[in-house]
């Protein structure tokens, strides 16, 4: 697809309240709502977590898989290990888990829809909750 020089950019912040220390929340419909509001039909969409103890990832929304992801995080970065950062704040595991998952995801926008695969959903990973969080969604492209 050919894109001209001039693009529109639309951005919106989404508030989110989490309820558990580790929580994986499907935000696909929230993000889709921002895309619809943007009026952009072709381009890219970025979802960014504005926090260093949370993450954004794309995967299948299946309850056993989500449980496996939580187990993988605990096995890879145990909450009770000895971390230097815990001398300041007792949440080093949350920061390290966020590094592994990443703080943003970018999705192509084609004909007004996110070009996600059949089983793909966008997730917000709370890694140090419960908290009030903010997610930034930016869409760039042509209407």
From Swiss-Prot:
Cross-referenced Gene3D superfamilies, in alphabetical order? YjbQ-like
The record, for InterPro entries, names: UPF0047_YjbQ-like, YjbQ-like_sf
Q: Which domain of life is it from?
A: Archaea
Alphabetical list of PANTHER family matching this protein: UNCHARACTERIZED PROTEIN YJBQ-RELATED (PTHR30615), UPF0047 PROTEIN C4A8.02C (PTHR30615:SF8)
What is this protein's record name?
Answer: UPF0047 protein MTH_771
Tell me the leader sequence span: none
A Pfam family annotated for this UniProt entry: UPF0047
Q: What family classification does the UniProt entry report for this protein?
A: Belongs to the UPF0047 family.
PROSITE patterns in the record:
UPF0047 (PS01314)
């Amino acid at each position: 697809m050919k894109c001209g020089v001039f693009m529109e950019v639309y951005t919106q912040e989404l508030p989110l309240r989490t309820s558990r220390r580790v929580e994986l929340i499907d935000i696909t419909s929230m993000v889709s709502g921002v895309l619809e509001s943007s009026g952009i039909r072709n381009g890219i969409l970025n979802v960014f977590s504005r926090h260093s103890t949370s993450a954004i990832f794309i995967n299948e929304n299946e309850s056993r898989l989500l449980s496996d992801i939580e187990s993988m995080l605990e096995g890879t970065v145990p909450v009770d290990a000895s971390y230097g950062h815990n001398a300041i704040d007792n949440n080093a595991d949350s920061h390290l888990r966020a590094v592994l998952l990443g703080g943003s995801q970018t999705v192509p926008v084609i004909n007004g829809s996110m070009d996600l695969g059949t089983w793909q959903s966008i997730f917000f990973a709370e890694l140090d909750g419960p908290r009030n969080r903010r997610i930034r969604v930016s869409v760039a492209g042509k209407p």
